[in-house]
Regions:
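Nucleotide/phosphate-binding catalytic cleft detector across ATP-hydrolyzing
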Residues: 1-14, 20-76, 80-207, 235, ...
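Residue-level signature of catalytic and energy-coupling elements of molecular machines
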Residues: 10, 19, 78, 174, ...
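Short, solvent-exposed amphipathic alpha-helical segments in soluble enzyme
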Residues: 25, 200, 342-348
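Glycine-rich phosphate-binding loops at beta-strand->alpha-helix junctions
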Residues: 81, 162, 262-264, 320-346
Length: 439
């Protein structure tokens, strides 16, 4: 019987933890084999603040995904997010010993390793070194220098930095939940892979991923990551505003936001009222949808304006840096009614909602194609793309060993030849090694 491979993406968010099991089908699409969800109780604004609760939530999501798929989860691809993440631009160069030899992968590795040695602020660690453009002997705008001749190799890098303690806590939760660490990605980059097309990345696009605890931004131009940022506000702060503004409990505030919430107050009439049941026999509380929308609008405007400042800081106003493809909204917060129209009004940029369905097989559940699961699908795609992280299919639950003797007599299949690692695989391994040793 032909061995089947599958991979797992684990999205550790502020409001939910999602485990998605999938594999690549013969058409290059992702086939979803199982999904598990759990309420996230130990994460605040993308950062673990309760180890025990986070471990329990991870185990619950993993167990549910195993039951749903009938498969055993061993290794997971995870994301890094949170307000501790920051990014910077850096240029560096190396002088090659022999300019008569063509530039090889080792030369690019040496240049990247040099960037990893940069001294950061106390308690910070470089977690991503992403090349943007290379120069060879002064010749600029080179995307791939390998195979060229030259003595001086330069590059511009987008460097992502994280807080060591925050990263260690995620690693500890993964390992304490009985899992191995596979692919590691900055979450907005994972979401971008799931919802953006290559054409959008080439034309210039800003991905805004509105999660429960944070709003993440990733800007692409000419197919290259140009800017990343984390805004420390997400859907949860909107819920908190509704809770305080309407004097109701958090659960009621969240339901109000989902069912009746709108980012555009003008859409609601003054006489539209919703009644909220009172607590322990108290009288019901009446709330006008107009007032509800005003509360939501005020916070959403604040978030969008902060994101727009980041977009302008990148240089969107410059003709050369213009984001022709506009803005793509994703994440659970992107489902807020009239948010798209408000973003277009504030920024003046074309905006669409990003769904991770383009890369999914046609028979995938409709639920998984929601913007809510963009990061999880992106993390799964990263795991699937790395052959080294594939795991053989095996039952999740205990089974009888009747086939044990029979299987011993079957002819061993030859192990497939490992593909040659490119520089991106090596950078991922470097980050993985750092996280594995972070305890």
């Amino acid at each position: 019987m032909k061995e089947t491979h599958y991979s797992v993406g684990l999205d550790i968010g502020t409001t939910k933890i999602v485990a998605i099991i999938g594999k690549e089908n013969e058409y290059g699409k992702i086939e979803i084999l199982g999904i598990g969800k759990a309420k996230s109780l130990g994460v605040h604004r993308g950062v673990v603040n309760n180890i025990t609760q986070t471990i329990e939530s991870i185990q619950q999501a993993i167990s549910q995904a195993e039951t749903d798929s009938g498969l055993k989860i061993d290794t997971v691809s995870v994301g890094i997010a949170g307000q501790h993440i920051r990014s910077l631009q850096h240029s560096d160069y190396i002088t090659r010993a022999n300019a008569e030899e063509v530039i090889g992968p080792d030369d690019v590795d040496n240049l990247c390793n040099q960037v990893y040695k940069l001294v950061m602020l106390p308690g910070e660690e470089i977690i991503h070194v992403l090349p943007q453009e290379f120069k060879v002997d002064g010749q600029a705008e080179i995307k791939e220098p390998i195979g060229m001749y030259g003595g001086r190799l330069e590059a511009n890098f987008h460097v992502v930095v994280g807080q060591v303690s925050s990263i260690k806590n995620i690693v500890r939760c993964i390992k304490s939940a009985g899992l191995k660490l596979g692919e590691i990605s900055l979450e907005p980059l994972a979401s971008a892979n799931a919802v953006l097309s290559q054409e959008e990345k080439e034309a210039g696009v800003a991905l805004i991923d509105i999660g429960g605890g944070t709003t993440d931004l990733a800007i692409f131009k000419d197919g290259i990551i140009r800017h990343t940022a984390v805004i420390p506000f997400g859907g949860n702060v909107i819920t908190e505003d509704i809770k305080e503004g309407c004097s109701i409990i958090e659960k009621q505030a969240e339901l109000l936001k989902i069912k009746f919430g709108s980012a555009w107050p003008g859409e609601n009439k003054e006489n539209e009222i919703v009644s909220i049941p009172g607590l322990r026999g108290r009288d019901p509380k009446e709330i006008t949808l107009k007032n509800l929308s005003k509360i939501i609008h005020a916070r959403v405007v604040e978030i969008v304006e902060q994101v727009y400042v980041e977009i302008k800081n990148y240089g969107h106003d410059e003709q050369k840096k213009k984001l022709i493809a506009g803005i793509v909204l994703t994440g659970g917060g992107s489902q807020l009614k009239h948010l798209k129209q408000l973003v277009e009004y504030i920024t003046g940029m074309d905006t669409r909602i990003g769904y991770p369905n383009e890369h999914l097989a046609g028979d995938s559940e409709e639920e998984i194609a929601s913007p809510l699961y963009a990061t999880g699908v992106g993390l799964l795609m990263n795991a699937v793309a790395s052959d080294a992280k594939y795991a053989p299919e095996q039952p999740a639950l205990e089974e009888t060993e009747e086939k044990g003797t029979e299987e011993q007599n079957t002819e061993e299949t030859k192990a497939p030849k490992a593909p040659r690692k490119n520089i991106f695989d090596k950078w991922s391994e470097k980050l993985k090694d750092f996280l594995d040793n972070a305890e």
